[in-house]
């Protein structure tokens, strides 16, 4: 890990705490915009439901967010980084193959959540305008929300370095506003504090006819807990844990303040109190304060959306490095480490968000679609966390009850959320299934490809390569010929590479270079190793890169060459006499292989589906040369047929007459 990055997120400081407010808590911090509104819906306000609901909210924030994520899961860091893929990279060391399943399901569910969070947060905030303009059409609200989304996704290409400076003070104002508004209402009806007693939650769940299914809406208060873990690398465990004390306090005050207001108006409905989009979040505000409250809420919702978008970019980047996702173009708009921009994902998210807004129109309708995907992610995190605790040799008498309790809690939330399937939950589930399918196909195809890749010992061909280099009867193909190789062992090489050099068209070069990229299970590391196979003839370079590092092979390779020349380990000047005496450096040529599925295959039905789907997706993804950051003018693409199962007997008969 780079020192600069390590220092960035490891220190506890006032600045670090403020940055944490601006980055980490957008999702969970904007939940008061819609949680109590979702719990009540169109029903008449009932004290039992309000007290039971707010008790469930308090204990969900305590058990799920505080204990599971802030205290336990944040301890499972991968060199300071968090998130479900970082956790998978840790437990991958156990060599348990099936752990890939919860990793893919969890990552896909988290990405699906990124499509619903911006629309519901921004819509909930913007709908507050109706407090001043009750007759405002729903379509007008929809257009405003889409406009905000368009601006938000458009500025992603410029990075968040500039606007990011305002995130922290803005979220500080937001949380201070939440706490103050809630506290004022509690002072009017202090009895609401009794809802801290878990009896009220139990009473709601066990006695009230629809009590259990209220959990589906209660869960919305903790959907942002996974983001606390995913963004740990930006702020650090200590900063998150300390700042959470302040954040949870303001959230609890606001939730209880909304509950106090509602109990005071028992017997009414939200629609009677605030019109079509009656929302207790805005109802507890003094009328004169509403303009300021709406603006602050909208800005907080935008910041929450920004955090989800940035998190999605990071997640896709990690998925690519772990071979879960096809290669896509990545840009680095600023020099801030870890900040990246993925154009294709950015606009897919945008159109997904717009689709959600157009389909559901109102935040109240979106509440039914929200929660199902993220609870799946949380369950998958719990499964992976279990193996992390085993890996850390945590005592069974502590680990087994802990994991069992959380699986029971989370499966209860899952069952409650499934009831919302027909009313909107199907949307995020369909998106999650689509993402799971892409990741599974890509991973299995890569695995099949690896299993059928033939490797040879490079020593068996060292002599012939050296002879080819000296064979003046063959035209020189390049001074330096560079091949990318997937062979993990330094003394091995794919058979197709040797075939390309010796048989497809003999390629004479002064020096042959074989470059291998090894993705590490830790996030930030850039190392390389040089293996001399034959002095001034054959070399292998192994790059060891963290799973969050950009793969800029062209720049890295040239840096390695400069270092080798400086050390006197290689002579890269042209061997043409006229050029050599003037110290002219020879040219470099990269040769990349592009596979296609051969017709000479007798694949099993499932392999046929996987491989055809893989090559279809591959056509839409980034080319190898762009993925490795190579200059297209110095790259040669060669196509190779991919034969996995050649037919054993094609039934051909020779005729002698």
Curated annotation (Swiss-Prot):
Cellular compartments annotated: Cell inner membrane
Main location: membrane
Catalytic activity, as annotated: K(+)(in) + H(+)(in) = K(+)(out) + H(+)(out)
Keywords: Cell inner membrane, Cell membrane, Ion transport, Membrane, Potassium, Potassium transport, Symport, Transmembrane, Transmembrane helix, Transport
Gene Ontology terms for molecular function: potassium ion transmembrane transporter activity; symporter activity
A GO term from the CC aspect: plasma membrane
Membrane topology category: Multi-pass membrane protein
Transmembrane segments annotated in the record for this chain: 14-34, 47-67, 96-116, 140-160, 166-186, 201-221, 242-262, 283-303, 340-360, 371-391, 396-416, 425-445
Highest taxon listed in the record's lineage: Bacteria
Pfam families hit by this protein: K_trans, K_trans_C
Function text: Transport of potassium into the cell. Likely operates as a K(+):H(+) symporter.
Matching PANTHER family: K+ POTASSIUM TRANSPORTER, OSMOTIC STRESS POTASSIUM TRANSPORTER
Family: Belongs to the HAK/KUP transporter (TC 2.A.72) family.
Protein's recorded name: Probable potassium transport system protein Kup
């Amino acid at each position: 890990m780079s020192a600069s990055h390590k220092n960035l997120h490891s220190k506890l400081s006032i600045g670090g705490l403020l940055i944490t407010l601006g980055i980490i808590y957008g999702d969970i911090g904007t939940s008061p915009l819609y949680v109590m509104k979702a719990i009540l819906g169109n029903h008449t306000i009932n004290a039992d439901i309000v007290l039971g609901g707010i008790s469930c909210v308090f204990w969900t924030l305590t058990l799920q967010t505080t204990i599971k994520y802030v205290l336990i899961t944040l301890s499972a860091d991968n060199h300071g980084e968090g998130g479900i893929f970082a956790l998978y990279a840790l437990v991958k060391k156990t060599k348990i193959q099936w752990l890939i399943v919860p990793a893919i399901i969890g990552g896909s569910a988290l990405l699906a959540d990124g499509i619903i969070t911006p629309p519901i947060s921004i819509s909930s905030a913007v709908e507050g305008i109706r407090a001043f303009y009750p007759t405002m059409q729903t379509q007008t609200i929809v257009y405003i929300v889409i406009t905000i989304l368009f601006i938000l996704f458009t500025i992603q290409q410029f990075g968040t370095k500039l606007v990011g400076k305002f995130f922290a003070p803005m979220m500080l104002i937001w949380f201070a506003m939440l706490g103050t508004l809630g506290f004022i209402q509690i002072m009017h009806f202090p009895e609401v504090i009794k809802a801290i007693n878990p009896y009220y939650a139990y009473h709601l769940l066990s006695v009230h006819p629809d009590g259990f299914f209220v959990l589906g809406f209660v869960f919305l208060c903790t959907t942002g807990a996974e983001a606390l873990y995913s963004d740990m690398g930006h702020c650090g465990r200590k900063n998150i844990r300390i700042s959470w004390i302040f954040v949870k306090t303001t959230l609890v005050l606001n939730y209880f303040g909304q509950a106090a207001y509602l109990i005071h108006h028992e017997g009414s409905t939200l629609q009677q109190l605030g019109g079509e989009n009656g929302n207790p979040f805005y109802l507890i505000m003094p009328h004169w304060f509403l303009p300021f409250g709406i603006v602050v809420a909208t800005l907080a919702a935008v910041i929450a959306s920004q955090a989800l978008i940035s998190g999605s970019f990071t997640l896709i980047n990690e998925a690519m490095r772990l071979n879960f996702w096809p290669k896509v173009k990545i840009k680095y708009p600023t020099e801030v480490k870890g900040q990246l921009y993925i154009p294709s994902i950015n606009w897919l998210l945008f159109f997904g968000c717009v689709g959600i807004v157009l389909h559901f129109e109102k935040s109240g309708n979106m509440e039914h679609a929200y929660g199902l995907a993220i609870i799946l992610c949380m369950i998958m995190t719990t499964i992976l966390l279990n193996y992390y605790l085993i890996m850390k040799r945590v005592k069974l008498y502590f680990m087994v009850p802990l994991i069992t309790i959380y699986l029971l809690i989370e499966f209860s939330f899952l069952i409650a959320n499934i009831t919302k399937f027909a009313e909107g939950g199907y949307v995020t589930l369909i998106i999650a299934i689509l993402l799971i399918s892409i990741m599974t196909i890509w991973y299995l195809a890569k695995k099949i490809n690896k299993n059928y890749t033939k490797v040879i010992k490079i020593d068996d061909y060292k002599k012939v390569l050296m002879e080819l280099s000296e064979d003046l009867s063959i035209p020189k193909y390049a001074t330096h010929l560079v091949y990318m190789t997937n062979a993990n062992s330094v003394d091995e090489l794919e058979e197709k590479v040797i075939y390309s050099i010796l048989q497809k068209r003999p390629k004479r070069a002064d020096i042959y270079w074989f470059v291998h990229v090894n993705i590490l299970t830790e996030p930030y590391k850039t190392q390389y190793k040089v293996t001399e196979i034959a002095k001034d003839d054959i070399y292998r370079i192994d790059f060891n890169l963290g799973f969050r590092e950009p793969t800029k092979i062209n720049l890295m390779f040239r840096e390695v060459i400069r270092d080798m020349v400086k050390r006197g380990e290689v002579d890269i000047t042209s061997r043409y006499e006229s050029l050599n005496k003037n110290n002219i450096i020879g040219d470099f040529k990269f040769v990349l292989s592009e596979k296609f599925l051969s017709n000479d295959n007798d694949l099993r039905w499932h392999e046929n589906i996987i491989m055809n789907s893989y090559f279809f997706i591959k056509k839409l993804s980034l080319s190898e040369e762009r993925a490795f950051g190579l200059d297209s003018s110095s790259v040669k693409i060669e196509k190779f047929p991919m034969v996995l199962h050649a037919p054993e007997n094609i039934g051909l008969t020779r005729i002698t007459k």
